[in-house]
Amino acid sequence: MIYDSQIYTVLCIALLAGILAIRLGSTLYE
């Protein structure tokens, strides 16, 4: 059984990881 809090936590981590990846990529390409 997956709780809403776990889903919310996973989504937040994925969002932060995506933002960090985009910022890192843009920094490398500059």
UniProtKB/Swiss-Prot annotation:
Source organism of this protein record: Phaeodactylum tricornutum (strain CCAP 1055/1)
| Subcellular compartments | Plastid, Chloroplast thylakoid membrane
The record's Pfam families line, in alphabetical order, gives:
PsaM
Name the residues that span the membrane: 7-29
User: What's this protein's name?
Assistant: Photosystem I reaction center subunit XII
GO biological process: any one? photosynthesis
What does UniProt give as GO cellular component?
Answer: chloroplast thylakoid membrane; photosystem I
Q: Topology versus the membrane, per the UniProt entry?
A: Single-pass membrane protein
- Similarity field: Belongs to the PsaM family.
Q: What is its main location?
A: plastid
Does the entry annotate any disulfide bonds, and if so which pairs? none
Highest taxon above the source species:
Eukaryota
Query: Which keywords are on file for this protein?
Result: Chloroplast, Membrane, Photosynthesis, Photosystem I, Plastid, Thylakoid, Transmembrane, Transmembrane helix
UniProt lists the gene as psaM
